[in-house]
Amino acid sequence: MASPSSRLLKFITNGSKLHSAKNNNMIKNKNIISPTITKLFSTSKISNEIGNIRNFNNKISTNLINSNINTKPFFEIPKLFEKKYYSYIPPTWEEKDKEKQFNSITSTREEGGDNEESNRMGNGSIKDAIVWVNHLYPIKVSRLDFRSLFFHIPITKKLNSLFPNDVKIISIEKRIKEGGAYIHFQYDSSNPEYKSIEMVMSKLKSIFAQEKKHFHFASRPAKCKLVYGRPFVEDIDYRFPSTTLKITFKGSEMSPDDLFRLMRPYGHIKDIHYSSPIPSKDGPRQATITFKRMEGAIATRNCLHNKYFPEFNTSLYMDYEQLMRINKLKEQFSKHPKIMIPLLGILATLLTLLLFNPLREYFINKKLSSPCYFGEQEEDDWQERSEQKVLQTHFNFPPNSIVMISAPKGSGKSSLIDKVLENRINTLLIDCNQEVNNNDEEFIESFSKDIGFSPSYSLYSSFGSVIDAIIPTGKGAFHSTTNYQMQTILKLLDEVLAKKAKQFPVDPHQPYEYPLIVIDGFFGMIQAMESKEKANIIMDSVIQWAITSTQRGHAHVVFLSSDSFAGDIIKKYLDNRGGGQISTIQLGDVQPSMAINYIKKRIGPNTPITQHDMELVVDNLGGRYYDLNVLSQRMIAGDSVERALSNMISKAVSEIRAEGFGLSKRNDDSKIGGTKLKWSRPQLWETIKKIAENDFVSYDDLLFNVFLGDESSLNNLISSNLLRFQNVDNERKVTAYSPLYCSAFKQMVNDLEFNVGMDVLVQKARIEEELSKLSKVEDELLKIKNLTSKSWFEPLSIKKRRILLEDKLKDHVAKIEHRENILKKHSLFQKFLREEQMIQMELIKKQREQSKFERQQQQLLQQQQLQQQQQQQQQGSI
């Protein structure tokens, strides 16, 4: 086998050829390599070749440094051939193991031997030894510890300066993750100062103590210790230092006293523990030693590993006991979930109380103290309401009742409350948008964001998901309930408001900007929420908190809702709490003069509008802000007032047919699945006819004459945004949801075909009702007949009953006949309409055929004229 020097000369020769060829421009591409070197580096022995050459290079460099010759290494491996992952290069003191097949640094002979002789190697008076120097780098405790990447300052010169000139350094083996380095050196034992290794170490320790050199901003100076054993130099990625050493005895077992005396010089020991009290026959005994500092465990392992002690007839093998890692944590969770899960729950609670709650309280207070700003609003000039001044005055005095602002959609209730909140401190606006808050988690997240509750419970949900992934048995352990989350959020908000209440003026008549909490669209969101159980929990929590806050005088609470029954829901809660006050403000449409001013402002002076057009707008749209805005956009786009109103009314009719009568595919109660109407079509049609005749109809009239006492159907119809309540002269009246819908009702009634068709349904439904009543009367008469069939004389009481039933029978029969006559008239009218439609269709067909015939005649005439012209041209040419 060729020696390293001969292999080196061969490598240098090939490298010089490559270098000369490159200089002569023979190699123009850097990817082209000489065949000899390509063959050499393509073999599987490339790692060993580079390792041997680098080792030889290190020897030469060290000798040059010890000889104080300032020169570069005489050969460098080209970076072109270096691999990303370098091959393992054994330390210099292990080279003689390969050559002599035994360790001359540390003897592992179990026959005994001289300690001094076992810690040195060499021939004659030249001896070798190894020292461990600590505090050179920051100790790496995990793969995520990147501190060592910032400390690549060379330390070779500093270490060389700490060694005497007559002590030669052979190599320096850096151990970055252990924070130190091995230094392999030689000394002359014939020197009187270096007769023994102890004298050498005494001089080195005194030099290190005098110099007190700090490496890489270390808090302590570097120290050196003699290596007695055979160091285990490794580059395993997942093995890191720790404070605990696991010691394996190869041979006899050492007592705790001997272990303590042997290892105490390297650092303070916290505990010594043996694996089992009785020696095991199956394998070697083990001991665990825990040091107070990690430097002590590192020094002990690096100095005493694989050391043979003849007095104890044993060798010590040491390894680090790894710290608790993520996989160990997962194992603990999987094995002991009943202990670890409650423990983590307690830690999470403590973290919440000590860290999260103060942060949340700070952010809520910051959100509450910031003034509200909504930007410029275009409708500020035209929409001036008396309710605005009333609310501003009410909110500047101590709270004593919940405020309910009820108004249909598009009536401007949000813009009204925005004006009240503009530039006002101590204000929170909670927007319960139905499109965002489809379930309880989305609502709680949105609610937390609006009041400034941060960190929110979404962080807990993420943490719980991670735990669920780690622990299969811990499913749902870290997911708090909806009730708990709402109670926690509202309780913390109440604490912030209670602290604010300490700053209130003593005189209750003194104006002050008291805290104001506005909740917009809450009841609509509750109705649209998927889980009704959780929706009820959220509604109960919020309303109970609102009642408590107002009764304590901490804050004004305002609910904005388009639901006509929202006030009744809060009244039920107040009655259950023993009473309370609720101030209800019913907002209607704005005055016609304000509506005209808004239209003029929106369309601008360039779009003319007549007085007749203004009257049409007021009659059909009233003062509904949303509809006025749509009309102004259509007028700006170029539509006339009549055309825009016609399109809007037609669209409203389509919406009523779809939502009210279910005359669309999406509301069709079919097998595919659709929403079933909570009222009957005849009930809605009769209501529409009454409202089209009179804009306002008594609630009781509809309840008893149209819905026949079915209050749930009437209330569902009102909640569907087709109808609405309005108090007129202290009487509850029912009208269309908007003036536009009222115009749509009138158009539907004026549509004869639709009117007759719906009236047919109404008459059939009424006939069925009369028939069911008639059937009951007939059954009763049969029972009376059976009672009197066996006697000659009819009792007076039974006779009166029979006469009453006969009168009812006649009345029902008369009603049925009347409605049947109406149906006959309707059927004749429908037949007439069908005939008219057929006649119109035939006329249209004849007109089309006539126009087609005329077009054909014109084409023939044109062809004849063209032929005549061609003939005349031919004759003229002849």
Swiss-Prot record:
As for membrane topology, the entry says: Single-pass membrane protein
Pfam family for this entry, one: RNA12
The residue ranges of the RRM domain are 229-323
Protein encoded by which gene? yme2
Q: Where are the transmembrane segments?
A: 339-359
**Which InterPro entries would you find in this protein's record?**
Mt_escape_2_C, P-loop_NTPase, RBD_domain_sf, Yme2_C, Yme2_RRM
Which named protein is this?
Answer: Mitochondrial escape protein 2 homolog
List the residue ranges forming a coiled coil, or say none. Answer: 761-873
Entry-linked Gene3D superfamilies? P-loop containing nucleotide triphosphate hydrolases (3.40.50.300)
Q: Which UniProt keywords apply?
A: Coiled coil, Membrane, Mitochondrion, Mitochondrion inner membrane, mRNA processing, RNA-binding, Transmembrane, Transmembrane helix
